[in-house]
């Protein structure tokens, strides 16, 4: 810090020298792609059943904490639904210009279950699976598909993000939909779907998948200085998850919404 105060190194360089819990490390895009734990369940994201109780859409290393959490919660509104695809992020956080940080995907039976079961077998359901699979692997180019899948893809999420982003989209009428949605990605604090968020895990433990998300944000903060962050939910939880150097490097780039503007998602 003395070098920083003396003006011999920049504030950013000073932050770079702070250590996190495991010591300072640089997270590269190559490392993220190689160590992406979601690759291990990529095979589940094929077929046509976007609601499938015969599948468990969860990382093996996350299951103990999730199963323990679900078994200890009497109120099923808090249970994580593993019969629908997990979504740690939507869009491509490695290429987006604005990263939306939220809490976890919401569950609504008429959307996540009923609409999923009504999707025609074939191109639509398989195409949506492909979009979600490619998103898991950082291989999509936008926040949502810009083709005939658009309507059904959004209905599965109760059109939530389409509605919220429409206010911004209307402000830039000169930008076509494809270009607009390429600028956004959503990263969830927890990848698993629930009707209501039921709190953290026992002993304040983090899921292994959350620790990978932590590394993902570290990469974005230090390798993508142009990226802005919009924290819609769980501000304090994100602050606790991220290392101090990452959080304080993010602060000037955080866009703050109005209080409770997006509280119900």
What is each of the regions a protein language model found here?
Residues 1-29, 169-265:
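Glycine/proline-rich loop-helix segments at beta-alpha junctions forming the active-site rim
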């Amino acid at each position: 810090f003395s070098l920083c105060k003396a003006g011999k190194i920049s504030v950013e360089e000073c932050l770079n020298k702070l250590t996190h819990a495991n010591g300072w490390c640089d997270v590269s895009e190559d490392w993220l792609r190689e160590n992406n734990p979601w690759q291990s369940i990529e095979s589940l994201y094929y077929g046509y059943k976007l609601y499938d109780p015969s599948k468990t859409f969860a990382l093996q290393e996350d299951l103990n904490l999730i199963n323990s959490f679900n078994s200890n919660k009497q109120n099923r509104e808090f249970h994580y639904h593993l019969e629908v695809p997990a979504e740690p992020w939507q869009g491509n956080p490695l290429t987006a210009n604005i990263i939306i940080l939220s809490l976890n995907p919401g569950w609504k039976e008429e959307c996540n279950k009923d609409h999923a079961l009504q999707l025609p077998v074939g191109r639509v359901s398989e195409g949506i699976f492909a979009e979600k699979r490619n998103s898991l692997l950082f291989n999509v180019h936008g926040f949502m598909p810009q083709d005939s899948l658009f309507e059904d893809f959004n209905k599965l999420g109760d059109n939530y993000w389409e509605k919220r982003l429409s206010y911004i989209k209307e402000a830039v009428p000169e930008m076509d939909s494809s270009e607009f949605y390429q600028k956004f990605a959503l990263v969830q604090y927890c990848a698993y779907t629930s009707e209501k968020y039921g709190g953290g895990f026992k002993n304040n433990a983090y899921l292994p998948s959350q620790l990978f998300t932590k590394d993902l944000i570290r990469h974005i903060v230090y390798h993508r200085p142009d990226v802005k962050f919009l924290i819609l939910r769980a501000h304090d939880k994100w602050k606790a998850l991220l290392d101090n150097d990452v959080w304080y490097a993010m602060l000037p780039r955080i866009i703050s919404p109005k209080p409770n503007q997006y509280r119900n998602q």
